Swiss-Prot record:
Keywords: Ribonucleoprotein, Ribosomal protein. It comes from Chelativorans sp. (strain BNC1). CDD domains: Ribosomal_L30 (cd01658). One of its GO terms (cellular component) is cytosolic large ribosomal subunit. The lineage of its organism: Bacteria, Pseudomonadati, Pseudomonadota, Alphaproteobacteria, Hyphomicrobiales. GO terms for biological process: translation. This is Large ribosomal subunit protein uL30. InterPro entries: Ribo_uL30_ferredoxin-like_sf (IPR036919), Ribosomal_uL30_bac-type (IPR005996), Ribosomal_uL30_ferredoxin-like (IPR016082). Pfam families: Ribosomal_L30. Coiled coil: none annotated. Gene3D superfamilies: Ribosomal protein L30, ferredoxin-like fold domain (3.30.1390.20). PANTHER family: LARGE RIBOSOMAL SUBUNIT PROTEIN UL30M, MITOCHONDRIAL RIBOSOMAL PROTEIN L30. Part of the 50S ribosomal subunit.
Length: 66
């Protein structure tokens, strides 16, 4: 079995409510693993994740980049 390389991770926290936001922004939050205020999610630091964060930068904040 091949070993999985450990890559960089990024932790994001939801700071804004998805209420009265477009469906695309709500779906992006779900894609990031966020669904309630002040919840945190640790994800791989990839260009696709960075793009998702950029789409909802007013609703999330980056807590940690490791």
């Amino acid at each position: 079995m091949a070993e999985k390389k450990k890559g960089k991770t990024i932790t994001v926290e939801q700071i804004g409510s998805p209420i009265r936001r477009p469906k695309e922004q709500r779906a992006t939050l779900v894609g990031l693993g966020l669904n309630k205020l002040h919840r945190r999610s640790t994800l791989e630091d990839t260009p696709s994740v960075r793009g998702m964060i950029a789409k909802v930068e007013h609703l999330v904040r980056v807590v940690d980049e490791a």
